[in-house]
Design a protein with these regions (language model features):
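C-terminal catalytic "cap/lid" subdomain
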Residues: 1-229
């Protein structure tokens, strides 16, 4: 993560960070080794973990950025008044050179734990549209989207001009620790490109992943489906 922070500092663009991990952090701190089924325990774990997550980001960005926490629910996007307030807050923070760190409000919202957004991939696409972002970069533990042709080794697809049902059907399931996976990233890419946003999926452990993805040298690139107004 320290490497990613340094890369973002060098890129010198305004950016918003959408981060998951509150529940996992909380479970670890509470000494719980399995994902609980009880809703109240999940939400309590999220409350414990979210503060630790923000403390980690404050340390990582110390001397580089002041960070701000925004915990969102689906209502923040479905209500016109709340959505307008969200957009105003995000844009004010960016004008102040403050880094908004966004997560789902897992500690109080039942619908978010049940997947109202689906996962943070969809949330990131919604946030990108809210701030009229030029780029959405989705970092994962693989090098991009791989085409499974049923014969031999899967092939990395460097450019996907349009997300189709066939591409989604080619995806594996959810990730180990979250609700998302490659299918959810494709859906996020579809939503973002429809809003005129460039999208990249890349391996977060790759050296220089941020500038290299922005220059389309690694990962899978999705061009926008329309020109932003």
């Amino acid at each position: 993560m320290r490497s990613l922070v340094d890369q973002l500092d060098l890129v010198r663009h305004d950016y918003v960070l959408v981060s998951s991990g509150a529940i996992a952090c909380g479970l670890s701190s509470l000494g719980i080794s399995h994902k609980p089924r009880q809703l109240d325990l999940m939400q309590a774990s999220a409350a414990v973990g979210q503060s630790q997550l923000m403390h980690t980001y404050e340390r990582l960005f110390f001397g580089k950025k002041v960070v701000a926490q925004l915990l969102l629910s689906s209502d923040d996007f479905s209500s016109p008044v709340r959505y307008r307030n969200l957009c105003n807050t995000l844009n004010r923070l960016l004008r102040m050179r403050v880094l908004p760190i966004v997560n789902e409000n897992d500690s109080v919202s039942v619908r978010e734990l049940e997947g109202a957004f689906g996962d943070n991939d969809e949330l990131s696409a919604l946030v990108a549209a809210a701030v009229h972002a030029n780029w959405l970069v989705l970092l994962t533990n693989v090098d991009g989207f791989y085409h499974q042709n049923g014969r031999g080794k899967p092939k990395l697809v460097r450019v996907i001009k349009r997300v189709t049902p066939g591409l989604e059907a080619n995806c594996s399931g959810k990730s180990q620790h979250g609700r998302g996976g490659m299918r959810s990233k494709l859906r996020a890419a579809l939503r973002a490109t429809a809003s005129g946003i460039h999208v990249g999926i890349a391996n977060g452990t790759e050296p220089g992943v941020i500038p290299r993805m922005l220059n389309r040298r690694i990962g899978t690139y999705f061009p926008p489906l329309r020109v932003k107004e």
